Amino acid sequence: NVSLSGGGDSGSYFVSAGYYNNDGVSYGNTFDRYSFRVNTQGKKGWFSFGENLAYSLTNTDPNQTNTYNDFLRMMPTIPIYDENNPGGYGYGDAAKYNTFGVNPIAREDLEYRHFRQNRLNGSLWLEFKPFEFLSYKFNGGIDLYFYENSWFRGEGNWTQNQEHRDPESQKARDNTYNMLIEHTLNFNKD
């Protein structure tokens, strides 16, 4: 994380940028976030103004299964990889290892999900105060959100008696925005 700030009698600023990464404690799970923020404000005569802008980008690759439960349900004698099975991963069979536990390594390798989120929040204000008893203020704000969910399932199995499925892929997107525009006139004379 890096930040820079400063100012004087007529204004001030603050700028920051950050990066966060977490690979998780279980196989196949990551999180990355990039963030940027800038705030400024100033005053000149009858006018004062300011803005606040924040942007973030997050990338998430979550686990596809409950890895801990799957490790407990799989017998320790079942190999992770087995070239005789579709996809090349080991899992139970009725003759030797009759379990319907999920091979968590196979599940993470064969099924992939990725979330990407962009978010921009900002506000801007301007105030005009020609007299102590009279002021006008404009306030504007915006919240933009862009979301993408990608999913891919490769060919192969991760548990016994699983039906064959051809590879498939899905992608979903969502874009939303909210805006605020506000005008305020204040009169306060005793």
Describe these PLM feature segments:
Residues 1, 24-121, 137-190:
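Surface-exposed loop/interface segments of Gram-negative outer-membrane beta-barrel transport/assembly proteins
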Residues 10-12, 16, 35-39:
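Transmembrane beta-barrel domains of bacterial outer-membrane proteins
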Residues 17-23:
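Transmembrane beta-strand segments that form the barrel wall of outer-membrane beta-barrel proteins
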